[in-house]
């Protein structure tokens, strides 16, 4: 390679990388997002999940935790499985180099890096796929793919971007396999995709099968077609098996703990209309990434024109055009037919961010645009004109029926028509030889990049308007104070304990602030333990996507080892004492918190839970303590509000016609002596569905309550002596409120104290290290260790170095039966299936190498 050619190639690849990066930098800067800026890129799930899980990984890489298991989420969680869904990127280790306070900037840098790598891999692959296409057009295709609306509209889910880095390489590898019998790139890139993101790997596998069937049309002879398809199948299967080191443990975790398949509720998907394909191929169009969205498929008007031209060009084999047309039709049918839509997504209905496979249609659009450009000199001007007229007509029909597309802004229509006209003029001038090829390529490139930049600007702006890009101050709020308090608790304790925050910012605060906790918001979760916790007052309903600590009792606190509470308000919970404070954040210690492993009096037998939370807590506490006490009783109460109406077991109040800003309802309650008081307010109906604020004033002291994803069960404080308590329920922002008659409950703290003393006096001490749990116990009788750890087949146990069986306890937890006397129990977590998966990966890789060598050897012999 000459110096000039080398430098030209280098500049080409630098441009491929930096074009999407610079556009994204400019677009994000327009949203006031840049390194160190007040606003951050952490919108929607980026704030609540992805950056927090990245922080968890960062802490583990710094030696604080295990890549296999973490106790900082949902009582305990298979972190290896979590990694496969949320952190499956070869770039994730880069988070190691940032501090916890720099994670917002780390997320920004790595997201930009991924956009650049998409452009780079696209340029590398498309240049080899479409050898007759000029580099300027290759850059148009690679930049269009990098900045497709699917990626930019969901940029906060930056783990998905890794799939787009690998996709062009996989397609290039497939072409090398089918055309030149070269299998290495296809095998390696597909294996990497399965390892990094099994979810998108599944979608890609479907696409590759369909795409290969169409590609076989170009291969002559049925025997050759069959042999090539078998070859494709063998290499694809070996790639899947080679990724078993990640796939098998993840699959086993999902089948054991994941949610069930989603059945189709109707034939058609929601919010669809006839011209969705063209409506979503306008410049800068964004409807929503919440429910009711239609697919994000924009990759640029230029690729779309060339994509349409592909199907009307006689220069391309009719059977090939029909094959691709059927593939496109299958995609479009999937957007409309719910069963097909679910099939692409593994028979699981997504929680927002719908049609997650639609990026594959964007990829196909770019590939067919490249095929068209590869033959552009052979096309007739009339066919080209027909492509422009067809797209113009489609846009016109979409505009006529724009009542179905209220999300399309006038600027999108104007820009789309303007760029369509610009491309039409350029192509017409070139085909009529009115401008030289260099001018045509230069101006087409400039218009294309400018169009993509504008579209990205409007899409990201709309994303920010819908979800809001949060401030850095908001993300780091209380970070310093909580970090210091958590550090103090770690210094003060040698045995295992849990901490929870009363005024949560996210469902994953425990992982964000690096303390062992209960709350969780994750697609990777233990549904069995979450369902059991739901029965015990930690709300986790439906598919168990959410699990929340807040709004439960001190019984639940103590049984699940909650030794510390973090709170901005003075805490009035029996057994909790103030330890210290940092700024406005207080640290409170629970003197009754149990160990991670509760030693029972005799062998533990499962009990039946009902739908009544307090009954379940009573039964569990009595079973673990060996007592038969009563803990909860109703506290007498009276509605003390003349403007509130009580009718048919419902309480209602409306202040719309008064000068009051919101509803307040007052009760008087008699709190028994030695009682922790609670109130249950079922089935609240809010006049403002966007404002579910509730504050409760107890004897003049007001506290804001948590109502998001929690039970409507609120703590009213501890009362040492019998008291007449005035309770005022306030609903800010709501001028009309109704709810079922509230129930006030008093927890007998004397009986509770006896039960917890009975449990905690037993000799059981628990420590943890990485993926191991160590229990030193002493028991006078044969007993059980009841572990408040989610049941998982990845756990193994030994007693005094002898392997023993771990049993399910209450469906979601674990127990180990232990003999009398002193002993040491060690639990070790290795993701279930990891050892087998590692062996399968090794064998599959060896088999692939042997297979590739054998085929190559056979081919050489046949040629000779």
Show where each model-derived region lies.
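Extracytoplasmic/lumenal acceptor-recognition loop(s) of multi-pass membrane glycoenzymes
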Residues: 450-468, 488-556, 594, 599-610, ...
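Membrane-embedded helix bundles of polyisoprenyl
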Residues: 21, 111, 115-128, 134-178, ...
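Periplasmic/ER-lumenal interhelical loops and adjacent helix-loop junctions
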Residues: 44, 48-49, 55, 229-231, ...
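Active-site-proximal, structured, solvent-exposed surfaces of multi-pass membrane proteins
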Residues: 2-4, 639-864
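Contiguous transmembrane helix-bundle modules in multi-pass membrane proteins
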Residues: 200, 326, 348, 354-478, ...
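Membrane-interface coil-to-helix junctions
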Residues: 10-13, 20-122, 143-164, 203, ...
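Membrane-interface micro-motifs in multi-pass membrane enzymes
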Residues: 80-85, 104-117, 137-138, 144-168, ...
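Start-transfer (signal-anchor) and selected internal transmembrane alpha helices
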Residues: 1-31, 443-444, 846-864
């Amino acid at each position: 390679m000459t110096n000039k050619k080398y430098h030209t190639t280098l500049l080409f690849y630098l441009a491929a990388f930096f074009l999407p990066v610079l556009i994204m930098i400019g677009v994000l800067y327009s949203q006031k997002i840049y390194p160190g800026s007040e606003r951050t890129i952490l919108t929607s799930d980026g704030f609540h999940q992805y950056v927090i899980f990245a922080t968890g990984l960062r802490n583990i890489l710094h030696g604080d935790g295990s890549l296999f298991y973490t106790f900082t989420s949902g009582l305990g969680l298979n972190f290896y499985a979590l990694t496969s869904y949320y952190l499956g990127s070869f770039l994730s280790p880069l988070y190691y180099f940032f501090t916890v306070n720099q994670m917002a900037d780390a997320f920004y840098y790595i997201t930009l890096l991924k956009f650049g790598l998409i452009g780079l891999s696209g340029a590398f692959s498309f240049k080899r796929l479409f050898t007759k296409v000029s580099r300027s057009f290759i850059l148009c295709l690679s930049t269009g793919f990098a900045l497709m609306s699917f990626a930019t509209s969901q940029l906060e889910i930056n783990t998905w971007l890794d799939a787009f880095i690998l996709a062009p390489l996989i397609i290039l590898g497939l072409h090398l396999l089918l055309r030149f019998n070269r299998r290495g790139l296809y095998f390696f890139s597909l294996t990497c995709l399965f390892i990094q993101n099994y979810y998108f790997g599944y979608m890609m596998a479907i696409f590759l099968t369909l795409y290969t069937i169409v590609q076989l049309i170009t291969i002559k002879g049925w025997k050759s077609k069959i042999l090539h398809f078998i070859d494709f199948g063998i290499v694809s299967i070996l790639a899947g098996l080679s990724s078993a080191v990640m796939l098998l443990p993840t699959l086993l975790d999902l089948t054991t703990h994941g949610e069930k398949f989603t059945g189709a509720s109707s034939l058609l998907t929601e919010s669809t209309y006839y011209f969705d394909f063209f409506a979503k191929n306008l410049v800068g169009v964004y409807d929503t990434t919440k429910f009711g969205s239609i697919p994000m498929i924009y990759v640029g008007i230029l690729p779309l024109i060339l994509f349409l031209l592909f199907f009307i060009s006689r220069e391309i084999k009719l059977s090939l055009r029909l094959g691709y047309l059927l593939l496109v039709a299958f995609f479009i049918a999937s957007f409309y037919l719910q069963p097909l839509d679910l099939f692409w997504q593994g028979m699981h209905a997504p929680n927002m961010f719908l049609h997650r496979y639609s990026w594959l249609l964007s990829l196909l659009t770019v590939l067919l645009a490249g095929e068209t450009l590869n033959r552009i000199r052979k096309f007739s001007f009339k066919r080209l004109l027909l492509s422009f007229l067809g797209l113009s007509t489609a846009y016109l029909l979409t505009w006529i029926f724009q009542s179905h597309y209220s999300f399309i802004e006038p600027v999108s229509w104007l820009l789309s028509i303007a760029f369509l006209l610009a491309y039409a003029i350029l192509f017409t001038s070139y085909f009529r030889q009115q401008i030289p090829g260099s001018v045509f390529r230069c101006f087409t490139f400039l218009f294309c990049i400018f169009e993509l930049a504008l579209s990205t600007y409007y899409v990201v702006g709309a994303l920010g308007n819908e979800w809001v890009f949060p401030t850095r101050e908001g993300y780091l709020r209380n970070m310093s104070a909580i970090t210091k308090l958590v550090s103090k608790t770690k210094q003060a304790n040698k045995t295992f304990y849990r901490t929870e925050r009363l005024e949560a910012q996210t469902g994953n605060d425990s992982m964000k602030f690096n303390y062992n906790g209960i709350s969780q918001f994750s697609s990777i979760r233990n549904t069995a333990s979450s369902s059991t916790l739901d029965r015990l007052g930690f709300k986790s309903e439906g598919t168990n996507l959410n699990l929340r600590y807040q709004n439960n009792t001190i019984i639940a606190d103590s049984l699940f080892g909650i030794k510390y509470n973090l709170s901005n308000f003075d805490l009035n919970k029996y057994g909790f004492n103030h330890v210290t404070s940092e700024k406005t954040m207080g640290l409170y210690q629970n003197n009754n918190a149990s160990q991670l492993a509760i030693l029972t009096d005799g062998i533990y037998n499962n009990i039946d839970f009902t739908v009544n939370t307090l009954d379940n807590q009573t039964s569990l506490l009595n079973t673990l303590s060996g007592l038969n006490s009563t803990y909860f009783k109703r506290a007498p109460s009276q509605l003390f509000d003349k403007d509130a109406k009580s009718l048919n077991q419902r309480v209602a109040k409306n202040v719309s016609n008064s000068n009051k800003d919101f509803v307040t309802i007052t009760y008087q309650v008699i709190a028994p002596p030695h009682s922790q008081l609670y109130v249950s307010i079922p089935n609240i109906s809010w006049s403002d569905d966007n404002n579910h604020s509730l504050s409760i004033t107890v004897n003049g002291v007001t506290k804001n309550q948590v109502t998001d994803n929690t039970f409507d069960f609120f703590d009213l404080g501890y009362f040492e002596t019998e008291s007449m308590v005035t309770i005022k329920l306030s609903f800010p922002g709501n001028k009309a409120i109704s709810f079922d008659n509230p129930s006030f409950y008093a927890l007998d703290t004397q009986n509770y104290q006896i039960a917890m003393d009975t449990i905690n006096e037993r000799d059981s001490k628990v420590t943890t290290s990485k993926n191991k749990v160590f229990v030193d116990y002493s028991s006078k009788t044969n007993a059980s260790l009841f572990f408040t750890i989610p049941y998982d087949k990845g756990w193994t146990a030994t007693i005094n170095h002898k392997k023993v069986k771990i049993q399910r306890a209450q469906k979601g937890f674990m127990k180990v039966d232990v003999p009398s006397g002193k002993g040491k129990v060690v639990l070790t977590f290795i993701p279930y299936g990891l050892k087998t998966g590692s062996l399968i990966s090794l064998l599959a890789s060896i088999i692939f190498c042997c297979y590739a060598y054998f085929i190559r050897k056979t081919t050489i012999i046949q040629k000779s």
